[in-house]
Amino acid sequence: MDSKFLNLSVGDWREVMIHTLGPSGTSSEAAAGFFTEWLGQRFPESQVQINLSDSYEHACSAMDERIPGVLIVANAYPQIHNFYMNPRLSLVATFVFDTPEYGLVSKGQLNTRKLTIATHPAPLMLIQELLPDGFEVDSVIFSLSTSAAAAAVARGEVDVALTTEVAAHIHGLQFISKTRPIRMLWSVFAPIRWNTQPVEVSARYR
């Protein structure tokens, strides 16, 4: 597991709150579980809780700087630069973690060949790769997460969603395509005060 980790300054925190993208069933939740496992091996006495938010931005806002906490963000997220540039945050670790299986799911038998598909923006390119023969994309609806995309199918708002096997199971959906994971790099941010090795500003810029 350590071979997939770059630990820059994760501390021996006794209680840690992990903030990331929800709801339950997202790849981010799975990545948070992987990070929890790493913490347990590195710091056996750590007690970890996971807090899921409907966006990475809301997850960041939910962090309480008075207690140890981290924000886990997929590097495929188009706006991840905002967290790297945030003066309140520091990058404390990165790790490689393959997502759960991704695929196209439906609620039942499809009555159309022209599909309205819900997806999070990040894995958009997978739609054409996974789309079964005989179907075409009529429109794409962006959701806040892959799990939210699955929920849109369950509510009958769209025909199909690009989502994870975990979210498909939660919402009782079935795959209509082949599936595959995504090899992903994840960034772990913490409030500056919990960074054990803060970045030093060069004297020439002070």
Where are these regions (language model features)?
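Domain-level signature for soluble enzymes in the chorismate/prephenate branch of the shikimate pathway
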Residues: M1-R206
